[in-house]
Amino acid sequence: MTRYDAVEAASYRVAREISLTGLSSWRDAVAPYFRPGSTVLDLGAGTGLFVRAFAEWFPDVTVVAVEPSAAMRSASGLPMLAGHAEAIPLPDASVDVVWMSTVVHHVRDLTAAGAELRRVLRPGGVVVLRSLFRERHSGIGLFRFFPEAARALSSFPTVAEVADGLGFAVDRLEAVPQVTASSLAEKASSVRWEADTLLRSLSPDEFSAGRARLLAAAAVETGPVVDHLDLLVLITVGGV
């Protein structure tokens, strides 16, 4: 999994974190899996956006955060374990849900990660992903201003590649809306080249041109920025 340095971690927190109000559709989407008394592993927890969200949304759920980057763990200010998808520092059969938000495209060995997921999941447990997939990106407004960023999609897996690579079956797939920013002006103020896999594929000139397009649109357009990421729920093959 990708590791971030201290500068990137700080930029990530500025550029990528979204208000809990903006994520309310995600609360509703995952609620069926976050049952009272369950244990959730936030795998690749970053700077802790969803650790905080789950604590507020589901106070009867225990969340364990694992993050490979020391800089991200430090920036979060939260208790987190060092680890990654291919080496999860938890006992066998210890969690009911594995949550992975914008993480799976960073996983280098899906087969090894799948074995680890099955190891730590209890019987009947699920893997819940919030992600962008190569063939499902029309709901991301970033491409309107930074069209060249689409070339980075070649490094993102498809839904089938994720399910097959991890060795799980698809139980649910749907696009979930989120208010990424209250306005294009807010989005423009927080966009960071170093904080986004898609933007990191751009040259300095491409990034500058895209930011100029974003600023020009922000000067005349009002209203919230709404993007759609996919909810993918995976179950063990045969549902065991």
Task: Show where each model-derived region lies.
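A short glycine-rich, Lys/Arg-flanked "PGG" loop and its adjoining helix->strand segment in the class I
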Residues: 111-123
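Conserved class I S-adenosyl-L-methionine
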Residues: 1-35, 49-53, 57, 72, 126-154, ...
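Class I SAM-dependent methyltransferase SAM/SAH-binding core
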Residues: 41-43, 47-87
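Short catalytic micro-motifs in class I SAM-dependent methyltransferases
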Residues: 102-106
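Short alpha-helix
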Residues: 153-167
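Conserved Class I S-adenosyl-L-methionine
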Residues: 19, 47, 172-240
